[in-house]
């Protein structure tokens, strides 16, 4: 475990999350974990057919993944060892009060899983900002705040060194 004084670098970068050389990438998934469009589809395509099989098994065992929750699979053919799939809020469904709370839960749930698999580096895709309609101007500061609050609460309990918020 890191000592209390260890700091974690948080960065915002533009790039292709499917090519990131990190321990964990975080996928903006749908509740069925079935792949789809946008970054979810790109991650599934790059990871290969084994990923959809893993996701189907998780779905059969546990059912749909609710908004704010996260699950983990292997990274398939990606450089990342693990993929954390989190289901973000749908802005028009959850609304301006519940959606930000669920978005924070997405980041916290994902980081909890990343810590559990002993990750030192994590790259997040933009959660809920595509077809789920979460306004980008609200999602970006919410993401930074959620990561920062998780790091503060979990200080000394993880090995996280680098957390990237990846924009495309």
Regions found by a protein language model. Give the residues of each.
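Glycine-/small-residue-enriched capping loops at alpha/beta junctions
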Residues: 1-116
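Phosphate/ribose-phosphate-bearing ligand recognition and processing surfaces
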Residues: 90-168
